Regions:
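Bacterial extracytoplasmic/cell-wall-associated proteins, especially those involved in peptidoglycan
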Residues: 1-120
Length: 120
């Protein structure tokens, strides 16, 4: 949650997406955990090898379900509060624009792909 969103409202929504994806038995597919797992800076691009790396933090691997084995950073109080009080939405996808800090949420995979195309 901490690394995916910059403000409290977005953090609560990211927390909700994580909860919903776990509830639906979907992989989390979060880039931030994948970067941590392969020890790359987020300014670098993840390669196909990185995305397929079978490390315990790579939530992009399709067969990886649930949370990583441990935290990827120290959470702020805002992130802890967001996890304890997630937003009430049905979103299951989000795209975080690391340049602007904007986070785009949707419950539609095609719309998520459009966010990725527009802001990625």
């Amino acid at each position: 949650v901490e690394k995916e969103a910059l403000n409290a409202a977005d953090r609560a929504m990211v927390a909700q997406v994580i909860n919903k994806r776990i509830e639906l038995n979907m992989n989390l597919g979060m880039d931030v955990t994948s970067y941590y797992g392969v020890q790359k800076d987020m300014k670098e691009s993840l390669t196909v090898v990185d995305l397929n790396d079978n490390n315990p933090y790579n939530t992009r691997v399709a067969t990886f379900l649930g949370l990583p084995v441990g935290p990827i950073c120290n959470p702020s109080l805002e992130s802890i509060e967001a996890v304890l009080n997630p937003a009430d939405t049905d979103y299951i996808y989000f795209y975080a624009d690391i340049i602007t800090g904007n986070v785009y949420f949707t419950d539609d995979y095609n719309e998520f792909l459009e966010f990725e195309r527009l802001y990625g």
